[in-house]
Amino acid sequence: MELNVDSAKQLLAEHEQELQSAHDAHSILLASQPITAATTHPNATASNAARAVPVVAPSSVPTPTAASTPFISTQPPAPAQTGRMQLIDEQQKFNSADFSPHLENWGLADAGFGYDLCAVLGSQSTGKSTLLNKLFGTNFDVMSESARQQTTKGIWMCKGLKMNVLVMDVEGTDGRERGEDQDFERKSALFSMASAEVLIVNLWEHQVGLYQGANMGLLKTVFEVNLGLFQASRAKTAGAKDKTLLLFVIRDHIGVTPLENLSATIMADLTKIWHSLSKPQGLELSKITDFFDFMFTTLPHKILQPAEFDKAVDVLRNRFVNPKDPNFVFKTEYHKRIPADGLAHYLESIWEQVMTNKDLDLPTQQELLAQFRCDEIANVAFAHFATSIKDFRKHIEGGSVVESLGADMALHRSTALSKFDRDASRYHQEVYKRKRIDLLDKLNGSLSPFFLGQLKNLHRLMLQSFKQAVLDRMRTEPNYDFGEVVSSEKRTALAKFSAAAQAVLLTDTDWTIDDEVVELDVEIQSISDTMRVEETKKMVAQIERTFNKNIGEPVELALKSAKRSMWDEVLISFSTLLEQAEATYVRKATSFNCTDDENEHALLALRRKSWMSMRAKVDEQTADSVIAAKLRNSFEDGFRYDDAGVPRVWKPEDDMDGAFRKARDETLELIALYAKIQAVDTTLMRELRSKFEDAEPVGLVVEDEAFDWHATLSVLSETRKNDIGMRFRKEADAMYVEAKRATVSSIAQVPLWMYGVMLVLGWNELMAILSSPVYFAFLLVLIASAYIVWRLNLSGPLISVLRAVANEVHRLADAQLRTHFSQPLREPRPPAESRPAEQIELEPN
């Protein structure tokens, strides 16, 4: 929707040749005098060439779209969160008391030139505040839809959201509240035009071509007063005139009349007004474009076309935030060159001049010339100064500490001030002194980043040096006192930092290192605390490893023999080792300067971890396989051995069933004994309960899981107890059946006549064996072997071994047979008569 107003430029063509050379000189001068921001700002980084765009954007520039500007949000910005202030109230009183605090809250007090200022002008209830809120994310009050009445009273100011732009919302003109009293309208319009870089003129499409409706009468008065009050004294100085951009925003544009025609109408009216002005001496031939640049844009109807309105506002916002936009509005030549910290005084002085100079009493020509020349000389001196300090940035930003930085900064600053004093001291002394102070502040502002960067690098270097020195002493000193080491190295680091920081402090500055020293002290203390925590953790970990190593054997020995006092032995060993671990911690923690809370928390954590380590050993000794072996051994001791420990040989008359039941029941009782840690001595349990169950966690450390000491006393759950009992019963039943079978086989009877038959039938074989020493000896060996197998009850294992041997022999034989039969059969040789004689003779046998 942005078009070039070619027709308007044609109306002004006859005046261009007269002041073209002056305009070129003005551009060259501005290019050599860049605005240097004290803080990073998008406008400060844009080149002057990029900003030197004439009256309106070229017609060849297409309308920006959301696709061509992906960095522009398609949604309106959120309301500003930094607050607003009433700069000038309804009684025309300037609110200087609240300006500086608001500037601090907005983060612009130290912005230097890194800010921009714009204002809006227009009739009452034309949506000025709504437009500003949409464009900049401000939170100015807007008119209620239900009652068309004055909303903005006086002049309000707010900072744009996420941009260093100060926005002034000016009370609307032609309001019924003030009626014919146009005094405040003129003053507020003149104030806005004199102070703002960009003045947004908000009007409806149907107001274009009107005289009062388009505020042309007001603009005529403002142009004339502004020209006489602020510009006449600079008429003879080429390129020194301040320029302001007038951005006409034509609202409720329906598209019937092109923007080109609307802008041409407005430019024609403005040119006519300018020609009718009573110009001061020296400005009779001046053109309106010598003091103002113009841009024009349109917006659709906000109510009838809300989507198109929002999209157009987004495109318009790009002019204010994107320095690369060809229609970027905050150009260098529009900036008033007032540092942010002096903005309050500057705006107040403008308002006082507007209020009190009824007859347009101007400052003297001497003061005006002094102001201009001092600014010019200061800019030249600062340019040489900026060139001479460029090398500092590379070293400082590279993280290096420049030892001679203080002396070098003082030398370059003194050189710049000397150049300024030599050339500027001839002019008005009050202006010279004021400008010298301004230059000194500017020089100090340029050196301040190097000063802060040097402190930052020193800060980082001292932290590294402190940490490395502490670690080196901890490695080289075997019996070091951690608290003494930290205190000593801390004093050394702070002393070195203070000495190096004092070397870069310059006179005539408000620089101080007190905050940096305090910050360094805090960070060193933080590093010390971190190192102390790490060393404490290492110490506790070493104590835990020692405890784990020592607790294993006592637990294993105590649980190996199942008896009622086994848990007493385990807990006594645990308490003894825990006391040793706590004593070791307390002895070593003394040198770490740990607080009582830290010690209490560490001891509590040590107790809990030690207990869990002991529980882990208990779990190892009560695993299913281990506890099954323990139960089996206990059962065998009671069933297969008598009270004297002699193996039993069961006879038919022995009470095997009673012995089996007794051994089984006694063994099953052991499961309940292993299931829970319960000492016979209740004193032990009370002491442990006081250490674990009654203690509350201390400090800021939160454990991953809640510690439930009472729950850790349970070793075997009910499910595990049932499973272990069932498996044991099966094993015990198997042992009983085996013993019973051996007894039954021993009492089986053979008929007596069978022995006679065997003797008669086997008499010959018997005599052959008895008469042969070899057979007889072999018979004796078999009888002895059988007796041994029977006596030691090895029949079961022997059968298992024989079965395994048979299976292995079967496997090997099967493998050999498969290998043999898997080979192909050799073909038989053909008979000799079917082969040639030569082949038969040559063929080997």
Curated annotation (Swiss-Prot):
Residues 823-845 are annotated as: Disordered. Residues 826-838 have a biased composition (Basic and acidic residues). This is Protein SEY1. It is found in: Endoplasmic reticulum membrane. The lineage of its organism: Eukaryota, Fungi, Dikarya, Basidiomycota, Ustilaginomycotina. GTP binds at G122, S123, Q124, S125, T126, G127, K128, S129. Its main location: endoplasmic reticulum. Keywords: Coiled coil, Endoplasmic reticulum, GTP-binding, Hydrolase, Membrane, Nucleotide-binding, Transmembrane, Transmembrane helix. GO terms for cellular component: endoplasmic reticulum; endoplasmic reticulum membrane. GO terms for biological process: endoplasmic reticulum membrane fusion. The chain crosses the membrane at residues 750-770, 774-794. Residues 1-29 form a coiled coil. SUPFAM superfamilies: P-loop containing nucleoside triphosphate hydrolases. It comes from Mycosarcoma maydis.
